[in-house]
């Protein structure tokens, strides 16, 4: 890796939206450090990065692991100019049936990990007086959804976190924003039967699912110099499914 090039750190870069973001960043000349929860995922990251960065295994529920991995990156003289919190999980269940572990796992992965990752990189960004912090949220944070009180709480928590953080670091040249996708075409949507497909589609004014590349484009914009005066904002990418 070239220490003179900008570097983006992306969680969950082995597939889906994370991979789409990483590939677009590479085209912009930005190096990528990507994470996955498995060695197989890391191999996939390294294959598509083609030398424009590297991947490594990271368990977002392990606080010590997050801190250690970030410190290792800095010790190797790599910078983290752009932090993209993309990884997230769902463990859906109605509240009356939800186990404590289902609540804890989702909150730790989707919300607490963002706190620990930001805390690990923020001092370096402040010292350089520049940085981008971008997190993938969800339309569910605004609309709610049956069976997802844990997921909704985790994504809603990110909104308040990012607004408060944006106020704390705005004078330091650091922007803090969220990209909030609606229904995006994934392996999940491809498994829907025609009735389920039409039910989901009926909630989207644009009458189609979003593409992961469209979410990635929003992230690329917020990471660019063109978005240098935007902070504490949530950029919705949902085809009109939710409007402020």
From Swiss-Prot:
Residues holding NADP(+): 12-15, 37, 59-60, 86, 151-155, 184
Binding residues annotated for Ca(2+) 3, in chain numbering: 234
Catalytic residues in the record: 151 (proton acceptor)
Similarity remark: Belongs to the short-chain dehydrogenases/reductases (SDR) family.
Name of encoding gene: fabG
Subunit relationships: Homotetramer.
Keyword Lipid metabolism appears in the UniProt entry: yes
Taxon lineage: Bacteria, Pseudomonadati, Pseudomonadota, Gammaproteobacteria, Enterobacterales
Protein name in the entry: 3-oxoacyl-[acyl-carrier-protein] reductase FabG
Protein task: Catalyzes the NADPH-dependent reduction of beta-ketoacyl-ACP substrates to beta-hydroxyacyl-ACP products, the first reductive step in the elongation cycle of fatty acid biosynthesis.
Pathway: Lipid metabolism; fatty acid biosynthesis
Miscellaneous comment in the UniProt entry for this protein: Calcium ions stabilize the structure, and may inhibit FabG activity by obstructing access to the active site.
InterPro entries listed in its UniProt record: 3oxo_ACP_reduc, NAD(P)-bd_dom_sf, Sc_DH/Rdtase_CS, SDR, SDR_fam
SUPFAM superfamilies to which the protein is assigned, alphabetical: NAD(P)-binding Rossmann-fold domains
Enzyme class: oxidoreductase
Catalytic activity of the protein: a (3R)-hydroxyacyl-[ACP] + NADP(+) = a 3-oxoacyl-[ACP] + NADPH + H(+)
PANTHER family, per the entry: 3-OXOACYL-(ACYL-CARRIER-PROTEIN) REDUCTASE, 3-OXOACYL-[ACYL-CARRIER-PROTEIN] REDUCTASE FABG
Binding site for Ca(2+) 1: 50, 53
Binding sites annotated in the UniProt record for Ca(2+) 2: 145
One of the protein's GO biological processes: fatty acid biosynthetic process
Pfam families, sorted: adh_short_C2
Enzyme Commission designation: 1.1.1.100
UniProt: substrate binding residues: 138
GO molecular function: 3-oxoacyl-[acyl-carrier-protein] reductase (NADPH) activity; metal ion binding; NAD binding
Top-level taxon of origin: Bacteria
Keywords annotated in UniProt: Calcium, Fatty acid biosynthesis, Fatty acid metabolism, Lipid biosynthesis, Lipid metabolism, Metal-binding, NADP, Oxidoreductase
């Amino acid at each position: 890796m070239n220490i003179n090039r900008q570097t983006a750190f992306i969680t969950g870069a082995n597939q889906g939206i994370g991979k789409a973001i990483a590939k677009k960043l590479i085209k912009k000349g930005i190096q990528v450090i990507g994470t996955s929860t498995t060695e197989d995922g890391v191999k996939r990251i390294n294959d598509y990065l083609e030398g424009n960065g590297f991947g490594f295994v990271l368990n977002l529920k392990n606080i010590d692991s997050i801190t250690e991995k970030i410190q290792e990156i800095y010790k190797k003289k790599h910078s983290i100019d752009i932090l993209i919190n993309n990884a997230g999980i769902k463990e859906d269940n109605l509240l009356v049936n939800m186990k404590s572990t289902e609540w804890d796992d989702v909150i730790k992965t989707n919300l607490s990990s963002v706190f620990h990752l930001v805390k690990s990189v923020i001092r370096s960004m402040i010292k350089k007086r520049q940085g981008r912090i971008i997190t993938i949220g969800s339309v569910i944070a605004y609309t709610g959804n049956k069976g997802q009180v844990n997921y909704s709480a985790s994504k809603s928590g990110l909104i308040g976190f990012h607004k408060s953080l944006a106020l704390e670091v705005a004078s330091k040249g650091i922007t803090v924003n969220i990209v909030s996708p609606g229904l995006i075409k994934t392996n999940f949507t491809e498994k829907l039967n025609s009735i389920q497909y039409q039910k989901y589609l009926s909630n989207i004014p644009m009458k189609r699912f979003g593409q992961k590349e469209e979410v990635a484009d929003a992230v690329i914009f917020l990471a660019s110099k063109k978005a240098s005066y935007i902070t504490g904002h949530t950029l919705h990418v949902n085809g009109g499914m939710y409007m402020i």
